[in-house]
Structure formats: C-alpha cells, structure tokens
C-alpha cells in the first residue's frame, strides 16, 4: 500500500514499437485508427481502437503516434535492404546506426533514457525494457548490421544498448 501511494503522481513514459506488419502499422490499421486516435489534441477519441482500455486514464495520457523511422532508410548503397534491421534502433533514437556486425555499435541515446534521466531519479526503477519476442540472436543479422540493432529500442548511450526482459516473472520480481 505504501509503495502504491509513493508511485501515485509519478510521471511515466511507455514507448511501444510496432513493426514488421503489425495490424496498426498497415494501411488497413492506419485507416481504422487501430493504434492511433483519429483526432489529435485533448479531444482524441479512443474508440474504436486498440487503445479503448485506456479511456479511464485519458486525462492523464498523451499519445504520440504516426512517427517515422526515416533514419532507418539506406544512406549508402551497401545499406540498401537493411531498413528492417535498423528500424528498432532508430525508433527512439532517430539516429542512423553504424553499419557493423561487431561490438562497436553506435546509434544514439534513446528518448526514453533522456526521460528516465530527468524523471526517473525519484523511482525505484527509472527504466524498464520489456519485449514479447526472443532477443537472443547472436552475431550479425543481415546487411552488415549487428542483431542488437534489431533487438533493442532503448539505448542509455550511443554505444550502450539496454537489455529487454521477456519473462513476465522476471519483470514482476524486479518490480
């Protein structure tokens, strides 16, 4: 009960990446506003959308949608075709990743980590990264890019990807 009281009033940020053909990122999903309200501003409408369960909290949330990952596009000829392998790293950094299959990765600090640095000091866990897919790929993925770019959206520094938790029990135990 004391921890619930302490958490009340704290500012939080949740960043959800939808890639690789999820319904909300297709032309159909965008037209149906599956993950983005049709109207912008304080009068946004959460129905009918996947966001409807957030309706009781609408006065406390801000939804940023329809962002792009243009920096995942190829800048040079050898990068052509690697957009998918760069997009997750670009999502919150908006930086173009260094093409490498080694440990010398470099992309940029992600916005969630800037947020955690500013608002997270007053919380027991300033930042937590969760995922629903396996992230245990090793080595290079394709097009000369390290798998860490595909597997990571949060970066504490340009060369420091943050590991994600897939197991709900591990996340619960940390909380």
PLM regions with names:
Residues 1-175:
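Ligand-binding pockets and gating/stacking loops
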């Amino acid at each position: 009960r004391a921890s619930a009281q302490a958490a009340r009033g704290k500012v939080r940020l949740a960043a959800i990446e939808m890639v690789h053909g999820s319904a909300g990122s297709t032309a159909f999903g965008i037209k149906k506003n599956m993950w983005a309200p049709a109207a912008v501003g304080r009068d946004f409408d959460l129905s009918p959308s996947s966001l409807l369960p957030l309706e009781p909290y609408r006065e406390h949330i801000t939804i940023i949608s329809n962002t792009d990952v243009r920096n995942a596009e190829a800048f040079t000829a050898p990068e052509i075709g690697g957009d998918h392998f760069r997009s997750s790293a670009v999502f919150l950094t908006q930086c173009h990743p260094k093409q490498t299959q080694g440990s010398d990765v470099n992309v940029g600090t992600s916005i969630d980590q800037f947020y955690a640095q500013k608002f997270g000091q007053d919380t027991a866990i300033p930042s937590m990264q969760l995922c629903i897919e396996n992230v245990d790929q090793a080595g290079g993925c394709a097009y000369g890019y390290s798998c860490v770019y595909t597997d990571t959206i949060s970066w504490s520094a340009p060369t420091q990807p943050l590991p994600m938790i897939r197991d709900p029990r591990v996340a619960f135990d940390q909380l």
